[in-house]
């Protein structure tokens, strides 16, 4: 009997939102996206101790002005190390996130994105396998516009509205990630109404974005995320 996952794959690309390499090997998604919290959760497991130890040893061989600089370096390199492993087991894209602390700084976001891409390329992973995940703030969207113009594909994340989505598409974002579950969470917390699969406001928001993009011929991919 065909599984729900296999049925879904017939109609849509499936993207894994995890740092667990074993789970990705098990479920064989098309693409994969990670974030710092998922990477942090993954490195708590002894399964990835070798990967963590290699990144830590590399950081100790470098000089840093401040401890925070070393911590930031380790976080970036861990995300890239996991990303490199993921490119070996999935056929499509791996999304790697720019530090959310930079979400309101266009210049710093662009600089960090280029550092991430350079690290991947130095490790033999071509940039066409990587999406740089950037928060859909105004500053983040301006960074995406610049990066896309320079051939660096971006995943515009933390999308909660049609206005945000259109701004990302106008900037040329390769892909956007509307957060279905978090939209539903907000409505549940701020309304006495009952919600189910037939009236989920998160799903309705993604449907509106998808239909708008189709109507006005935007090429930006809509990747619904954060399902509950």
What are these regions (language model features)?
Residues 1-19:
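N- or domain-start disorder-to-order transition segments that initiate the globular core
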Residues 38-41, 46-137:
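Active-site beta->alpha loop and helix N-cap motifs at the rims of alpha/beta catalytic domains
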Residues 13-15, 31-33, 93-95, 129-133, ...:
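Structural preference for beta-strand elements that scaffold enzyme active sites
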Residues 82, 87-88, 118, 141-150, ...:
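Alpha-helix-loop-beta-strand connector modules within alpha/beta enzyme cores
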Residues 19-21, 37, 99-103, 135-137, ...:
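Active-site beta-loop-alpha junctions enriched in small/polar residues
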Residues 35, 96, 132, 147, ...:
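Conserved, mostly hydrophobic/aromatic
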Residues 28-31, 143-154, 170-176:
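Glycine-enriched alpha-helix->loop->beta-strand junction motifs that scaffold or abut catalytic
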Residues 155, 160-228:
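Catalytic alpha/beta core domains of metabolic enzymes, predominantly
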């Amino acid at each position: 009997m065909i599984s729900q996952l296999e049925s879904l794959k017939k109609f849509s690309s499936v993207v894994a939102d995890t740092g667990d390499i074993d789970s990705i090997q098990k479920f064989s998604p098309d693409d994969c996206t990670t974030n710092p919290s998922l990477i942090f959760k993954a490195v708590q497991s002894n399964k990835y101790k070798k990967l963590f130890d290699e990144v830590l040893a590399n950081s100790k061989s470098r000089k840093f002005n401040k401890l925070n600089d070393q911590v930031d370096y380790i976080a970036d390199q861990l995300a890239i190390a996991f990303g490199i492993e993921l490119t070996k087991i999935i056929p499509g894209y791996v999304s790697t996130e720019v530090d959310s602390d930079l979400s309101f700084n266009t210049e710093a976001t662009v600089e960090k994105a280029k550092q991430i891409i350079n690290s991947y390329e130095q490790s033999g992973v071509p940039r066409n396998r990587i999406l740089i995940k950037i928060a859909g703030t105004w500053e983040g969207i301006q960074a995406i516009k610049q990066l896309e113009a320079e051939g660096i594909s971006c995943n515009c994340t933390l999308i909660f509205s049609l206005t945000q989505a259109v701004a990302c598409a106008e900037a040329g974002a390769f892909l956007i990630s509307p957060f279905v579950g978090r939209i539903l969470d907000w409505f549940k917390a701020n309304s006495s109404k009952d919600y189910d699969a037939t009236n989920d406001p998160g799903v309705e928001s993604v449907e509106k974005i998808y239909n708008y993009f189709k109507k006005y011929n935007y090429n930006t991919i809509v990747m619904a995320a954060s399902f509950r």
